[in-house]
Amino acid sequence: MAYPVQLGFQDAASPIMEELLYFHDHTLMIMFLISSLVLYIISLMLTTELIHTSTMDAQEVETVWTILPAVILILIALPSLRILYMMDEISTPSLTLKTMGHQWYWSYEYTDYENLCFDSYMAPPSDLKPGELRLLEVDNRVVLPTELPIRMLISSEDVLHSWTIPSLGVKTDAIPGRLNQATLMASRPGVYYGQCSEICGANHSFMPIVLELVPLKHFEEWLLSML
């Protein structure tokens, strides 16, 4: 989860999020090198008299500043496309979870099981237990197994919403009349928090998401208690 005055991303808890962090660092380093070069050239122009007022043509320079940006864009595009394909690829899922957005709560349905569905509202501050987070805790957590591919089917009953878990690298819009799909696979157990990330009305800020990722054995025990 995020902490006050935190500048970086949340700790990655899925292979996709790890790839996104690597891509962020890769792109940031390229931006840093370009910015350093531009600042160096600006400082050089301000502190020296290396100007060529009589130069009318410089094909070598024009060739360099055409090819170099193209190479840089390719270096950014290739890993970006790789991650996009990874996020879109869904192998045979072990579990399917259907998520519906409402004003202003989420409803979940485990489509592989009969009658396993529930609504998830933000827990009011008066009901919070010690250690639970204000505005982020819910009355019904989503429990899922770790280290297994899970297919998320996401839609909305009313307006646009967005189902987002930053530490898992998942952000999918919930659009009325459309069923969007996402992949989720957690690499370690834990409790992961998210929120609706699309302004959806007066109580948009009060649509938290809580995932409880547990080992498969504990997930099976939870299933038996719910069915």
Curated annotation (Swiss-Prot):
| Cofactor note text | Binds a dinuclear copper A center per subunit.
For this UniProt entry, which segments traverse the membrane?
15-45, 60-87
Membrane topology term reads: Multi-pass membrane protein
Q: Where does Mg(2+) bind?
A: 198
Task: Cite the binding residues for Cu cation A1.
Answer: 161, 196, 200, 207
Q: Name one GO cellular component term.
A: respiratory chain complex IV
Keywords of the record, alphabetical order, are: Copper, Electron transport, Magnesium, Membrane, Metal-binding, Mitochondrion, Mitochondrion inner membrane, Respiratory chain, Translocase, Transmembrane, Transmembrane helix, Transport
Query: GO biological process: what's one of them?
Result: ATP synthesis coupled electron transport
Chief location category: mitochondrion
Mitochondrial matrix topological domain: 46-59
Catalyzed chemical reaction(s): 4 Fe(II)-[cytochrome c] + O2 + 8 H(+)(in) = 4 Fe(III)-[cytochrome c] + 2 H2O + 4 H(+)(out)
Q: What are the subcellular locations of this protein? A: Mitochondrion inner membrane
Known EC number: 7.1.1.9
Question: What Gene3D superfamilies does this protein map onto?
Answer: 1.10.287.90, Cupredoxins - blue copper proteins (2.60.40.420)
CDD domains membership: CcO_II_C
GO function terms (MF aspect): copper ion binding; cytochrome-c oxidase activity
Give the cofactors, semicolon-separated.
Cu cation
Give the family, as the similarity comment puts it. Answer: Belongs to the cytochrome c oxidase subunit 2 family.
Oligomeric form and interacting partners: Component of the cytochrome c oxidase (complex IV, CIV), a multisubunit enzyme composed of 14 subunits. The complex is composed of a catalytic core of 3 subunits MT-CO1, MT-CO2 and MT-CO3, encoded in the mitochondrial DNA, and 11 supernumerary subunits COX4I, COX5A, COX5B, COX6A, COX6B, COX6C, COX7A, COX7B, COX7C, COX8 and NDUFA4, which are encoded in the nuclear genome.
Kindly provide the name given to this protein in its UniProt entry.
Cytochrome c oxidase subunit 2
Organism whose genome encodes this protein: Eulemur macaco
**Gene this chain is encoded by:** MT-CO2
